[in-house]
Amino acid sequence: MIWKIRDRATFDALTSSRRRRRGPISMTFLPGDPSLPPRVAYAVGRRVGPAVVRNRVRRRLRAATMAHRAELQPGAAYLFGAGPAASSASFAELDAAMGELLAVADRS
């Protein structure tokens, strides 16, 4: 199971953490309590496009997260951000970029 990030303290900690970018998406990672499930949030700004495009990108990011859920560290908090290039990226490109980002987080 994957939880949503809802508390302000976690968002503040994530924004002060180091950001990694691979292709059209970026990821900020914060280790946490391994007894809890991983927590995920998505940031898709207006620079990506109109609401229809932003929602499509967000749905694709959620689907890619579910495809890689075994790679998420228990208790960790992840913030995935989408840049303007994400609007024209295919699901396969977003999925590959997320896989690379999660592999980098695994090594740290």
Features from the language model and the residues they span:
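Positively charged, solvent-exposed patches that mediate nucleic-acid binding
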Residues: 1-108
